[in-house]
C-alpha cells in the first residue's frame, strides 16, 4: 500500500502521527510519503497545491489528511485552493460520514439511544462548484448568486453507492432533500433514487425534507440506516450527526472516488484547532477512526475491523478522562 500523508495545519500533524502509529501496528510495512501542504507552505512559497503534487498524489492508493486551516491565511484561501481543489481534481464525489454512538460515549440526547447510520453526501456538485457571481458590488443594488449544479451523472453515481451500502447494512435508505421548494434539483434526485431503487428491491426507501430530517436525527436517530443527500444538505446534517454521536472530535470521514481511478482521502472533520496546537491535548480518535475507513476502502477489512474494535474498547473505558494526544494513540495501538 502506498499512502500519501498530509498533516496540514494546527493539530493536523499531531493527530495524524497517532493515526499512523495505529496503522503501523495493524498493518506494518505501509509505504508512506509525507507532503507539506497548508499554511506553512503557502506563506513560504505562495503555493497551495502545485500541479506536480497533484500528479504525485495520484500515484498513491490513498491519502490521509490531518486538517487544513490557519487564522494567518485569509478565509477561503486554503479551503478552496487546497481542500476543495483536492476533492475536485481527484473526483471525490462521495463524502462518507459514519454516525455511530459508541458504548461509553455520552450523547446530548436523553437516554443515549442506539445510533448507527451513515451519511452518503454528494461531494463535487451542488452550490460548491463556484458557479455564480456578483454585480454592482458595494452598492445598494448589489446582486449575488450561487448556482447549485446537479447532474444526472453525478447524482446517479452517489445514489448507487448509497444503495450498495444500504444493501450491506440494514437495507434502508433515506433520501434527504427539500423537494417542495428546490423543485428542479429535487425532481432529479427523486427520479434517480426511484430508478436506481428498482435494481435494489430488497432496500426500503424513505424520504425526508432536510428540516424534518434534522428533527428526527435528534428525536429518533435510530430510524436512519443510510442517508443520501446533496452537497449542501450533507454538509449541514453530518455536523449534526457528529454532535448527537458524542461530538465532532469523534467524527471520521472519507472523500471517495467510487471509480477508484484516483486515491480517496480520509480525514477527521474537527478542523485544525490552532488554539490548542502544540499543546499535546488534541484528541486523535477521529483520525484513527479515519484510518479504519481507509483500510476498509482498500479491502483490508480484517485490519479495519481490528482498528474499529480497538477504538470501541478504548472509548468504553475512557470515561471522563482526557489523555494526552500521544497516550491515546499508544492505548489504541496497544489494544490491537
From Swiss-Prot:
Highest taxon in the source lineage: Bacteria
Site (Important for catalysis): 128, 178
GO biological process: L-leucine biosynthetic process
EC number annotated for this UniProt entry: 1.1.1.85
Record note on cofactor: Binds 1 Mg(2+) or Mn(2+) ion per subunit.
Annotated GO MF terms: 3-isopropylmalate dehydrogenase activity; magnesium ion binding; NAD binding
Name of the encoding gene: leuB
Protein name stated in the entry: 3-isopropylmalate dehydrogenase
Enzyme class (EC, first level): oxidoreductase
Catalytic activity: (2R,3S)-3-isopropylmalate + NAD(+) = 4-methyl-2-oxopentanoate + CO2 + NADH
Function as written in the Swiss-Prot or TrEMBL entry: Catalyzes the oxidation of 3-carboxy-2-hydroxy-4-methylpentanoate (3-isopropylmalate) to 3-carboxy-4-methyl-2-oxopentanoate. The product decarboxylates to 4-methyl-2 oxopentanoate.
Positions bound to Mg(2+): 211, 235, 239
Naturally occurring in which organism (per UniProt): Mycolicibacterium paratuberculosis (strain ATCC BAA-968 / K-10)
Protein's pathway: Amino-acid biosynthesis; L-leucine biosynthesis; L-leucine from 3-methyl-2-oxobutanoate: step 3/4
Entry keyword set: Amino-acid biosynthesis, Branched-chain amino acid biosynthesis, Cytoplasm, Leucine biosynthesis, Magnesium, Manganese, Metal-binding, NAD, Oxidoreductase
Keyword Disulfide bond on entry: no
Subunit details: Homodimer.
Residues annotated to bind NAD(+): 271-283
Residues at which substrate binds: 87, 97, 121, 211
Subcellular location: Cytoplasm
A cellular-component GO term for this protein: cytoplasm
Pfam family, one: Iso_dh
Listed cofactors: Mg(2+); Mn(2+)
Protein family membership: Belongs to the isocitrate and isopropylmalate dehydrogenases family. LeuB type 2 subfamily.
Amino acid at each position: 500500500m502506498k499512502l500519501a500523508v498530509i498533516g496540514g495545519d494546527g493539530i493536523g500533524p499531531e493527530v495524524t502521527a497517532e493515526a499512523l502509529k495505529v496503522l503501523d501496528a495493524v498493518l506494518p510495512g505501509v509505504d508512506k510519503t509525507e507532503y507539506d501542504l497548508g499554511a506553512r507552505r503557502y506563506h513560504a512559497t505562495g503555493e497551495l497545491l502545485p500541479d506536480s503534487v497533484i500528479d504525485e498524489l495520484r500515484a498513491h492508493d490513498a491519502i490521509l489528511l490531518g486538517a487544513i486551516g490557519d487564522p494567518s491565511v485569509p478565509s477561503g484561501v486554503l479551503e478552496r485552493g487546497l481542500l476543495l481543489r483536492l476533492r475536485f481534481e481527484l473526483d471525490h464525489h462521495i463524502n462518507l460520514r459514519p454516525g455511530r454512538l459508541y458504548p461509553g460515549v455520552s450523547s446530548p440526547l436523553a437516554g443515549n439511544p442506539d445510533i448507527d447510520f451513515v451519511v452518503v453526501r454528494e461531494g463535487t456538485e451542488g452550490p460548491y462548484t463556484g458557479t455564480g457571481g456578483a454585480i454592482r458590488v458595494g452598492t445598494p443594488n448589489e446582486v449575488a448568486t450561487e448556482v447549485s449544479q446537479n447532474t444526472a451523472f453525478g447524482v446517479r453515481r452517489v445514489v448507487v453507492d448509497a444503495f450498495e451500502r444500504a444493501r450491506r447494512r440494514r437495507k434502508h435508505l433515506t433520501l434527504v432533500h427539500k423537494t417542495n421548494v428546490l423543485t428542479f434539483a429535487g425532481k432529479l434526485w427523486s427520479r434517480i433514487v426511484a430508478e436506481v431503487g428498482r435494481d435494489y428491491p430488497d432496500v426500503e426507501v424513505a424520504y425526508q425534507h432536510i428540516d424534518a430530517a434534522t428533527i428526527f436525527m435528534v428525536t429518533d436517530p435510530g430510524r436512519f440506516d443510510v442517508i443520501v443527500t446533496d452537497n449542501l444538505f450533507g454538509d449541514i446534517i453530518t455536523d449534526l450527526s457528529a454532535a448527537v454521536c458524542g461530538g465532532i472530535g469523534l467524527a471520521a470521514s472519507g472523500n471517495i472516488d467510487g471509480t477508484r481511478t484516483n486515491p480517496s482521502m480520509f480525514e477527521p472533520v474537527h478542523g485544525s484547532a490552532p488554539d490548542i496546537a502544540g499543546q499535546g491535548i488534541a484528541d486523535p480518535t477521529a483520525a484513527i477512526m479515519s484510518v479504519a475507513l481507509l483500510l476498509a476502502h482498500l479491502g483490508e477489512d480484517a485490519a479495519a475491523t481490528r482498528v474499529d474494535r480497538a477504538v470501541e474498547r478504548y472509548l468504553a473505558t475512557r470515561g471522563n478522562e482526557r489523555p494526552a494526544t500521544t497516550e491515546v494513540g499508544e492505548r489504541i495501538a496497544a489494544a490491537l
